[in-house]
């Protein structure tokens, strides 16, 4: 009799553990095909920070490799990325749903910093090289968002876990209030961003605070392998510290 009770107790524990594992799996954000992630529509800017982010939105010139894709949708589903097979542009020449640039801004050491981030399904300078997923970003440092004509003080595009720093940027890399950024690899190195004199394309801007809770949670918790989400809660301020150009 005691043995039967013991077996029942073990079965109950196993069932509880399995139930908890299933619940945890159900709570994890889902991963979908990279070309099925729908971007957030660009909202009308309302706040001071949103208007400044829209005013200084950069343009991206893709020299080689993938075009930027949405990384997450409003339900918190993230793109699964691509293997490094095929050419650097294979399977990632642009999303049929449209693209996205992600923004987040704050005061940092008395300078207003606006981080703009792009997601790419793979970072592959050549077939078999590189890795699944890529995140790149540029930080635009301005004087004050709450004045009629803020000044661009510096620009710091991301490059191989570090930054190029321009304080101030050259006039020929700025189109009005828009920094011109290029995305390029120098074989055999992976892709990076830098400023350029070439005009680029704009993507719909969504700010961190404008996204759904599900989307922010996904970007805070989902692993993108060798790439990390620059504007999430764990990376945003440390990257501003590292990119400080003054």
Swiss-Prot record:
Domain of life: Eukaryota
Key words, A-Z: Secreted, Signal, Virulence
Motif mapping: Hepta-peptide GHRHDWE motif II: 130-136
Coiled coil region boundaries: none
Domain notes: Key residues/motif important for the effector activities are degenerated in most NLPs, including the nlp24 peptide consisting of the conserved region I (11-aa immunogenic part) and conserved region II (the heptapeptide GHRHDWE motif) that is important for phytotoxic activity.
Protein name: NLP effector protein 2
Species name: Phytophthora capsici
Pfam family, one: NPP1
Localization of this protein: Secreted
Signal peptide start-end: 1-19
Family stated for the protein in its record: Belongs to the Necrosis inducing protein (NPP1) family.
């Amino acid at each position: 009799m005691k043995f039967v009770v013991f077996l029942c107790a073990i079965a109950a524990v196993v069932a509880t553990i399995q139930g908890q594992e299933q619940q945890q799996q159900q709570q994890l954000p889902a991963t979908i095909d990279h070309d099925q992630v729908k971007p957030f529509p660009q909202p009308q800017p309302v706040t001071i920070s949103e208007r400044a982010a829209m005013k200084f939105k950069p343009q991206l010139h893709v020299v080689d490799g993938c075009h930027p894709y949405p990384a997450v949708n409003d339900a918190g589903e993230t793109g699964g990325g691509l293997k490094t097979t095929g050419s650097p542009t294979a399977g990632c020449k642009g999303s049929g749903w449209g693209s996205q640039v992600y923004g987040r801004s704050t005061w940092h050491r008395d300078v207003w910093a606006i981080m703009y981030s792009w997601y790419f399904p793979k970072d592959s300078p050549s077939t078999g090289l590189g890795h699944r997923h890529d995140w790149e970003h540029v930080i635009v440092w301005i004087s004050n968002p709450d004045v009629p004509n803020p000044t661009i003080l510096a620009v710091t595009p991301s490059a191989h876990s570090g930054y190029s720093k321009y304080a101030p940027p050259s006039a020929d890399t700025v189109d009005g209030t828009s920094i011109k950024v290029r995305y390029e690899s120098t074989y055999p190195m992976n892709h990076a961003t830098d400023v350029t004199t070439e005009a680029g394309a704009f993507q719909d801007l969504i700010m961190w605070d404008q996204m759904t809770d599900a989307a922010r949670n996904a970007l805070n918790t989902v692993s993108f392998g060798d790439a990390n989400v620059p504007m999430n809660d764990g990376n945003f301020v440390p990257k501003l510290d590292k990119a400080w150009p003054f």
